[in-house]
Swiss-Prot record:
Any one GO molecular-function label of the UniProt entry: chromatin binding
One GO cellular component term noted in the UniProt record for this chain: nucleus
Presence of the UniProt keyword DNA damage in the record: yes
Protein name: Ubiquitin-conjugating enzyme E2 T
PANTHER family: UBIQUITIN-CONJUGATING ENZYME E2 (PTHR24067)
Top enzyme class: transferase
Catalytic activity, EC: 2.3.2.23
Region annotation Disordered: where it falls in the sequence: 158-194
InterPro entries in alphabetical order: Ub_conjugating_enzyme, UBQ-conjugat_E2_core, UBQ-conjugating_AS, UBQ-conjugating_enzyme/RWD
Residue ranges occupied by any UBC core domain in the UniProt entry: 2-152
Organism: Danio rerio
Pfam families: UQ_con (PF00179)
Primary subcellular site in the record, as a coarse category: nucleus
Length: 194
């Protein structure tokens, strides 16, 4: 019961006051399966990209962290090819930093910061980490290329996904709405902050 009421509050807050460049919504109307989008930050190799994440909420939430992974491929030392994310806030102590006082919004913001500032000393992808440390121009070039190939919206406001199936005709529409929401949220924040 605590999990459901907490998730409802968090989703209301994420809808009313999302972090800049972030949007989050229920997947198929299920409260324990969410999707989020993060807009790549300015002056990063991910700039202009919209990255979709899958979020699974465990039964023991908030005493156990949400499971998050990127659905959009991203070239990053702390994110592997399956989309898994190496971030302390997604792990329980003693190895991690998850606490029940953290929430989905906080973790999404932490992921956004990790995208802007990779941690090459705690990598999931050793080869990308080495590139980041010793050949940063090559890392930046590859990360920009991956962003252009996988995360840049081909049609204005549309995020292409592998989830488009005849059974789920509304998926494209909801992704279009959320992609615009994340981008509009970022643009609104820029206007307010300037």
């Amino acid at each position: 019961m605590q999990r459901v009421s907490r998730l409802k509050r968090e989703m209301q807050l994420l809808t009313a006051e999302p972090p800049p460049g972030v949007s989050c919504w229920q997947s198929e109307g299920r409260l324990d399966e969410l999707q989020a989008q993060i807009v790549g930050g300015a002056n990063t190799p991910y700039e202009g990209g919209v990255f979709t994440l899958e979020i699974n909420i465990p039964e023991r939430y908030p005493f156990e962290p949400p499971k998050m992974r990127f659905l959009t491929p991203i070239y990053h030392p702390n994110i592997d090819n399956a989309g898994r994310i190496c971030l302390d806030a997604l792990k329980l102590p003693p190895k991690g930093a998850w606490r029940p006082s953290l929430n989905i919004s906080t973790v999404l913001t932490s992921i956004q910061l990790l995208m802007a500032e990779p941690n090459p000393d705690d990598p999931l992808m050793a080869d990308i980490s080495s590139e980041f440390k010793y050949n940063k121009p090559l890392y930046l070039e590859k990360a920009k290329k991956w962003t252009a190939e996988h995360a840049i919206q081909k049609n204005k406001g549309c995020v292409e996904t592998d989830g488009k199936t005849p059974e789920n005709k509304n998926l494209k529409t909801s992704h279009k709405r959320e992609a615009l929401s994340a981008q509009e949220n970022l643009e609104h924040t820029k206007k307010v902050c300037l």
